[in-house]
């Protein structure tokens, strides 16, 4: 049975919700799924004053354990058109895995959030996907089999490069049903691909 890791960083809980949806989709495909987060780099007193969501139940991941999974789905919010430094810092530490080819042929995908529709969703997805491709991973996005990403009836995230959500400038907008379903769909597709490739 394929093992899938949903690896995320979420300051305010939006990406945490998307991670849970992606994990649910991967489980629907029959994969064994773990949800883990990367360590925060923000001092706790600063995180508290900024009202970060500090009660996230997912355990902290280690770089070494990435090699144990058949698929890794990476979720992180956008910071000025790129992935947040917490995730970049974590992935930067995977040079040893890269050097050994430990992630070659594994399946990967990405999801993100932005404050606005034009806040850099696709650029952030590319920044994640670029890392995964350097690791030798096979990338699975949010294909147009998920037709709801084509809706014009409401503000919604979504891209063929990965599931996304829009948070609003103050973070008050929570992931919509369409956005969560997109993450679930992508998680299922990634797990299905991992099962085909790795059993």
UniProtKB/Swiss-Prot annotation:
GO terms for molecular function: flavin adenine dinucleotide binding; FMN binding; NAD binding; NADH:ubiquinone reductase (non-electrogenic) activity; NADP binding; NADPH dehydrogenase (quinone) activity. Binds 1 FMN per monomer. Its cofactor is FMN. Its EC number is 1.6.5.2. It holds the Pfam family FMN_red. NAD(+) binds at residue 12. It comes from the Bacteria. Residues 4-190 form the Flavodoxin-like domain. Keywords: Flavoprotein, FMN, NAD, NADP, Nucleotide-binding, Oxidoreductase. It is an enzyme of class 1 (oxidoreductase). It catalyses: a quinone + NADH + H(+) = a quinol + NAD(+); a quinone + NADPH + H(+) = a quinol + NADP(+). GO terms for cellular component: membrane. FMN binds at residues 10-15, 78-80, 113-119, 134. Substrate binds at residue 98. Belongs to the WrbA family. NCBIfam families: flav_wrbA (TIGR01755), PRK03767.1 (NF002999). This is NAD(P)H dehydrogenase (quinone). It comes from Xanthobacter autotrophicus (strain ATCC BAA-1158 / Py2). The lineage of its organism: Bacteria, Pseudomonadati, Pseudomonadota, Alphaproteobacteria, Hyphomicrobiales.
């Amino acid at each position: 049975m394929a093992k899938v890791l949903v690896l995320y960083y979420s300051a305010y809980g939006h990406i945490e919700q998307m991670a849970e949806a992606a994990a649910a989709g991967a489980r629907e495909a029959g994969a064994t799924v773990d949800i883990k987060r990367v360590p925060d780099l923000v001092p706790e007193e600063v995180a508290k004053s900024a009202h970060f969501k500090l009660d996230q139940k997912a355990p902290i991941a280690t770089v070494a354990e990435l090699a144990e999974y058949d698929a890794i789905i990476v979720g992180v919010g956008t910071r000025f058109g790129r992935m947040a430094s917490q995730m970049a810092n974590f992935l930067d530490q995977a040079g040893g895995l890269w050097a050994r080819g430990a992630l070659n042929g594994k399946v990967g995908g990405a999801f993100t959030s932005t404050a606005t529709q034009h806040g850099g969703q696709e650029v952030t997805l590319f920044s994640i996907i670029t890392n995964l491709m350097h690791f030798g991973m096979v990338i699975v996005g949010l294909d147009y089999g998920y037709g709801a990403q084509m809706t014009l009836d409401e503000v919604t995230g979504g891209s063929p490069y990965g599931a996304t959500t829009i948070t609003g400038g103050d973070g008050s907008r929570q992931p919509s049903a369409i956005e969560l379903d997109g993450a679930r769909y992508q998680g299922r597709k990634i797990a299905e691909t991992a099962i085909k490739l790795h059993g």
